Design a protein with these regions (language model features):
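Short, basic/aromatic recognition patches
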Residues: 4-25
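Generic structural signal for well-ordered alpha-helical scaffold segments
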Residues: 14, 18-21, 60-64, 143
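Zn2+-dependent cytidine deaminase-like catalytic core
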Residues: 34-136
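Generic detector of well-ordered alpha-helical segments enriched in charged/polar residues
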Residues: 11, 136-143
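Acidic, glycine-enriched active-site microenvironments
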Residues: 29-30
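Phosphate/diphosphate-binding glycine-rich loops and adjacent basic-rich segments that engage nucleotide
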Residues: 141-151
Length: 151
């Protein structure tokens, strides 16, 4: 994928994240866009009102089998562990056969931290940093809550 396409798709994911910003309880509003192996958008999602479902879940459910070999653009590191049971987003991405994840910024929350490492251990190519400045601004309040032990 080209850097230009990466920036455009991350911009789309960040726009999705802004839709529910402040409406997702203690969870951050995340945006996710899934491309198939040919580079076509096959799914997208934003964290649901109240914090569930996660953006990756919505996008992967929409993409279905078309996600195989594709790329996921996610505004915040996919969770490594699930607080409410079920599979974590990093596990769901792996099980869907995603080949590459482009993540704007890592997540310091204990349940998410390590999601990138889990994806890489599964053989998924992960790139971090496209859209980082915008994501850092979007998640500033969430990051402060995590560091203060309130999230």
């Amino acid at each position: 994928m080209s850097r230009r396409r990466d920036r455009r798709m991350m911009g789309r994911a960040l726009a999705l994240a802004r839709l529910n910003h402040g409406l997702t309880a203690e969870n951050p509003s995340v945006g996710c866009v899934i491309l198939d192996a040919e580079g076509h958008i096959v799914g997208d999602g934003v964290t649901g009102l109240g914090g569930r479902p996660h953006a990756e879940e919505i996008a992967l459910d929409e993409a279905g089998a078309a996600a195989l070999g594709g790329t996921a653009y996610v505004t915040l590191e996919p969770c490594r562990e699930r607080s409410a049971g079920g599979s974590s987003c990093s596990t769901r991405l792996k099980e869907a056969g995603i080949a590459r994840v482009v993540c704007a910024i890592t997540d310091p929350h204990p349940l998410a931290e390590g999601g990138v490492t889990a994806l890489r251990k599964a053989g998924i190519r992960v790139e971090i940093g496209i859209g980082r400045a915008t994501a850092a601004h979007l998640y500033d309040g969430f990051f402060r809550s995590v560091h203060a032990g309130k999230a």
